[in-house]
Structures are given as structure tokens and as C-alpha cells.
Amino acid sequence: VPCVFPSPRRPGLYRGGQRCAALAAALLWAWLCMLALPVGSMAASEALPRPQATVARCFDGDTLKLTDRRVVRLAGIDAPELHAPQGDKAQYYAREARKALTERVRGRKVTLRAAGVKHKDPHGRWLAEVLLEDGESLNEALVREGAAFFYPHRDLSPQLQERLRAAQREAIAAKRGLWAQLLSQPVAQATYLGNKESLRFFPTDCAAVQHIKPRNRVYFGNLMDAFMAGYAPARVCPFWPLVP
């Protein structure tokens, strides 16, 4: 459409000018949308080096080792620790989580897909969404069956975060896996304080909550509310039940 401006002598040309202005506005809006696109969503489409691999072993419920010696941390999820910060005991459901991961992938071929801005964590482990041979997301499957929980991060692909958040809500509602007993433990009835900036939550008596800015604080009446909101437990002040 040619850009024709309104003229008092040729009023019929005003409509063409309107179309030109609308086209220019649409192009400007599309350009602004591209600038506003989250970096994580663009990075998530990038291929990781050597994406095809075979799993050799599983260290726990969220970390595995490939036959080419690479160690992969499943992005966007976390599983109970086999060696709890409070001591040598395992956290509740840690052994079951490792078993669930092992049964799904040990000795099998997988595909690694970038999950966000960063490809490696501070420990040198590859961060990835792992796809099974049928195309199913391993990260999402573990959360959906209650073998792991959603662990949000600003660098993570927004699309992956939304899928994991939805899978967790489904698992909680159905009381699958770790949710079957965790939400009936005394810790489930305690109150928690979340940080809107980090998307982590803490027991309200944790000293670390004093460092959360008032505008970033969100209160949860119980444990389920915190998880349903998409927050994850902070590393400090661990409250997860332990097993011998």
C-alpha cells in the first residue's frame, strides 16, 4: 500500500493514509516484540554439542552420566538429596527418585536439548532438557510422576518452565510419588516465606528471610501453597524430612 497522505482537495486518499499508518504501526509493534522476547526462549532452540548420547548411570534423581563421560543436570527440576545437608541421612524420597530415573534411562539413548541461556552450571555439568527415544521430555515426566519437583530459574526457557509448573500441579493434585506422603508430614502444615525475585521459599523462622526485601516477600500458609505457586525450597534452612 503506497503511503499517501490526506489532502483537502482529494479526500478519498485519506483512507490510503490510514492503511499506511496501520502498516507502519504493525511493523513497529512486531519489532518491539522481538526485542522483548525472553533470551531464554531463543537460547532454548539452540542445539547442544553432541546432542545424541547414551546414559551410563544415574547419580541421583536429577543428574546422570553419559557414556562419553559428560555429566548432565536435568534443567528446571530438583530431586531430594541422597546425602542431606543436615547430615549423612537421605532426604525423604531420594532413593525412590534415583530409582525412577535409573529405570527410565540407564543404558538407553537420549537427546539433549538446550533449556535456557546457560549450557553449563557452576560445577561444569551440562544443563539440558533430556528427550527420550519417543520424544517425551524426561524432565517433565519425572515431575509429572512426582519423582522430582519444579526448580524455576531466570535463565530457564519460559516455555519449559510453564510445562514443568503444570506437570507439578498435576502431580500434587493426584498425590503422585513424593507428594503422597510429604504433604501429610508436619512440615506441610508450617508457614513459609517466598522471595519473588529468586522464586525460592524458606521456613518463616529461617534467618535468611531477613535479607528478603519487603516488596519481594510472599507468604504461604502451608507447604502445598508454596509448591503450587511454582516456588522451590531454598538451599539454606533445609526442612525436608529425613530417612535412615
Where is each model-derived feature located?
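Small beta-barrel nucleic-acid-binding modules, primarily SNase/OB-fold domains
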Residues: 2-14, 18-27, 31-244
